[in-house]
Amino acid sequence: MFVTNFLPAQRADLDYVAACVSVIEMDGFTKVKDIQLANGSNALRGICITPDGKYIYVSHNLGRFTVPTSQLQQGWMNTSAFSVIDVDKQEFLGAIVVDEPERGAAGIWSIACNDESVFISHSGTHEVSVIDHKAMLEKFLNYPNKAVLDYDLTFLYGLRERIPLEGNGPRNMILNGDKLIIPTYFADILNIMDINTNEVTSVELNPEREETAENKGERYFNDASHCFQNWQSCNGCHPGDGRTDGMNWDLMNDGVGNSKNCKSMLFSHVTPPNMISGIREHAERAVRAGFNFIQFFEVSEEDAVCVDAYLKSLRPVPSPYLVNGELSDLAKEGQKVFEKLKCGECHSGVYYTDMKYHRIGEDIEFEKGWDTPTLREVWRTAPYLFDGRAATMKEVFSVHKHGIEKKVSEKDIEALTEYVNSL
């Protein structure tokens, strides 16, 4: 069995950061290996197997985190791709980019195939790609240097047709015989495509539906039409309902050559200042700057207010470390360690942040230090510290001694880790 991992499970301060596909042995249900995809692979959403059982296709985002976020042309920040895995060898062969040189195909989501075609939904550009399967595979297998294929924006020339859909935000889809059935997440419209003719008919499932400001904001957050050449949406760096892609990015708002780990948007509007360096005084400013300097798009104030409303509506997912919704016995011990080490002097209040700057840890870039992040839902925002140098929360304490100025036992570190991961 091949299982996608949504995000990279590693430290982020490396030259190669990518999510993996795990191979599971079904007899004992044990993991055989992890197959790491192309550099920058994240948000692994779709997976399918070819009819002959030879190849696995995985649809995902490609984050170009090794360069500053200074432009968007030709997929400078984010591109969309699907990776090819050899089933028998259990090896990654290469990644095929589905964008075009002057037009992105953002929000890649689901993937399906039959002998004749490969079908891919694009939630950010509201369309489906139909790729000539046999011609694509032949060209792929004969490609001279697959290590650089994930930068080739011309690979699918003449092999792919982009079919626009009714509605907004096509995500999951079903291939059923000669029909491809594609609902749109933000419009409640069902698209049915005849795969023999590529003709699309649509049905409104909820014609009386009315959008709230939060609904509109979520739609704008995921819509690549609010971006220069449709290369990305806010979802490109903040997948999984406004959370994080697990990678470091060199934004231009606090200098160049100083990449920092992507932050979750959860509680961003109630824990100012914003960004790891605190360079934005509040989240409202950060939202508008994000459209201007990351999407390269002039967002209207009306739309920006809706995005604010959406982000304010985000709520934490209960931690899987909880037991029946309560702290485990180990986490309760960790709470005592948290208090003993005076972690609450910085991580205080309902959001576990005093919203102040502190000089803590290594390589302090700014004289005033770093903005104190919330610890709520921190279990799902690895890696940790300003540049993602800690792959796990335990490493924050055991390796990097974050805020710990005296010797702490392994038992206490285990308990502290359990507690923080339970918040």
Name each region found by the language model.
Residues C20-S22:
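Charged, compositionally biased non-catalytic regions
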